[in-house]
């Protein structure tokens, strides 16, 4: 059924919940996992930040992304699965575009990612990478919502 499962990871608790669900799917289907972290350099790439200052910030973002991927891979290995990892950089400002692109290049048949469930003005101001992936993807997308404060951990 799902043989190639792309998991978008960002280091958040919601992302970890998404990874846990992806592991369950992979175990039940015999699927393989690709962990993807997107470094969005547009966050700080402006005309107001001189290169001398931005270069160390970009490097810190890359290092943080590599750590996030390594931690996620450790979770996968503890579940007796293997995975591939990919750190992707974008200047487009659209993380969703990169996630969908990576899914296409790897020929994923499922994308799994966490969603923070923003509503109202926060959603309008910040947008939603998860919603954009859902709109752009030609393969099924499994969105895992953040755990509400009153909900017990599974």
Question: What are the roles of these predicted feature ranges?
Answer:
Residues 141-151:
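Short, flexible loop segments at boundaries between secondary-structure elements
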Residues 3-52, 75, 79-86:
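Small/aliphatic-rich secondary-structure junction motif
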Residues 110-132, 150-153:
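Glycine-rich, Arg-bearing micro-motifs that act as flexible, cationic patches
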Residues 129, 137-138:
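Short, structured coil segments at secondary-structure junctions
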Residues 74-111, 151-154:
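Structural beta-alpha unit
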Residues 38-67, 150-154:
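Acidic, proline/glycine-rich short linear motifs
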Residues 51-54, 102-104, 129-130:
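Short, hinge-like loop/turn segments at secondary-structure boundaries
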């Amino acid at each position: 059924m799902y043989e190639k499962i792309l998991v978008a990871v960002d280091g958040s608790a919601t992302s970890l919940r998404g990874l846990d669900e992806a592991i369950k799917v992979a175990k039940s289907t015999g699927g393989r996992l690709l962990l993807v972290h997107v470094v969005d350099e547009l966050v700080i790439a402006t005309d107001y930040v001189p290169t001398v200052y931005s270069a160390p910030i970009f490097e810190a973002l890359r290092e943080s992304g590599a750590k996030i991927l390594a931690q996620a891979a450790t979770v996968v290995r503890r579940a007796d699965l293997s995975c591939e990892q990919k750190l992707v950089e974008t200047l487009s400002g659209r993380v969703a575009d990169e996630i969908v692109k990576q899914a296409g290049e790897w020929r994923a048949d499922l994308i799994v990612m966490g969603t923070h469930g923003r509503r109202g003005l926060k959603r309008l101001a910040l947008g939603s990478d998860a919603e954009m992936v859902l709109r752009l993807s030609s393969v099924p997308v499994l969105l895992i919502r953040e755990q509400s404060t009153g909900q017990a951990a599974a």
